[in-house]
A protein has these predicted regions:
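Helical hinge/lid and interdomain linker segments adjacent to catalytic or ligand-binding clefts
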Residues: 1-70
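A glycine-centered loop/beta-turn motif at secondary-structure junctions
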Residues: 24, 40, 46-54, 115, ...
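Generic alpha-helical propensity signal that fires on short helical segments
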Residues: 63-65, 69, 213, 250-253
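Alpha/beta-hydrolase-fold serine-hydrolase catalytic core, especially in secreted/extracellular enzymes
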Residues: 241-257
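Intrinsic-disorder/low-complexity, polar/charged segments
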Residues: 13-14, 110, 226, 257
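An acidic, glycine-rich "communication" segment
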Residues: 53, 57-168, 177
């Protein structure tokens, strides 16, 4: 059709269409992505790209589970990142999200998890909407991923408590290339890119919804960000910053004078 927008699949039909973008935000589309190309996404990430994907975009990392499409996840993704389950989920109430404070597969501190907890504490995001003190309220959780101790490439950031389906990974990240070799001096691998998977709907919090049925700007309320939005804000800041190993504490920013 003349003058019609290009198909969204044209974005990922070749790596050169992805490389102009610093970050890709893949927001849930209500089903597994049609005709995705995980291999091209991996090429983009391995070259230093960043990806934030939510809910049904798990199919980029796991391959399609329920849609019976033909594309597959790269061999070093899939079950190397997490244990995956398909579907949309039907839990729209608030559950508690536990901030992960230790590195996956060890008892060593996860410095960025500690920073996330401090951020959420300082912004008043924890213990809201009836969840336990020190936990993040999560509306519309979706239970598609579990990062286990054998999933060495991945780091869980927030895990569901027993008020929902306990032990499900609500946020996790992994650096790329997944199989990057350690440096010659035995230090951390030279990672280039980073991906974050968010298994929830940020807009699920009722406080984010416009119920006035009026057009902007009259319907725009000057209210605080929801707890989930504050967590999202932190994750986007981290995603867009320099890639440093999860074992390293994030540097302290220098205030602009």
């Amino acid at each position: 059709m003349a003058n019609a927008p290009e198909s969204d699949t044209n974005l990922w039909d070749m790596p050169s269409h992805l490389t102009p973008y610093d970050i890709l935000l893949l927001s849930c589309e209500g089903d597994e992505t049609y005709n995705a190309n995980p291999q091209n996404l991996e090429t983009y990430l391995n070259a230093g790209g960043r990806v934030f994907a939510s809910h049904f975009h798990y199919s980029w990392f796991s391959g399609p589970i329920q849609s019976m499409q033909a594309y597959t996840a790269p061999a070093d993704w899939g079950t190397n990142l997490a244990t995956w389950a398909g579907g949309g989920g039907n839990d729209n109430n608030a559950i508690g999200g536990i901030i992960d404070l230790v590195l996956n597969g060890s008892m060593s501190p996860f410095p960025k998890g500690v920073s996330l907890q401090k951020w959420l504490t300082d912004t008043g995001a924890l213990g809201q909407n009836g969840v336990a003190a020190g936990e993040l309220s999560i509306f519309s959780p979706r239970y598609n991923s579990v990062v286990g101790t054998t999933d060495k490439a991945s780091q869980a950031w927030i895990t569901s408590d027993s008020s929902g389906m306990a032990g499900q990974t609500m946020y996790f990240s992994f650096d790329t290339p997944v199989n990057a070799m350690a440096s010659a001096d035995g230090g951390a691998p030279a990672y280039c890119g980073r991906a974050v998977f968010s298994d929830l709907h940020v807009a699920g919090d009722p406080s984010t919804k416009d119920t006035t049925n009026t057009a902007p700007p009259a319907s725009c309320a000057d209210t605080d960000l929801s707890p989930q939005e504050k967590a999202l804000e932190f994750m986007l800041f981290d995603l867009s910053s320099c890639v440093i190993p999860d074992t390293v504490a994030p540097p302290i920013g220098i205030p602009i004078q």
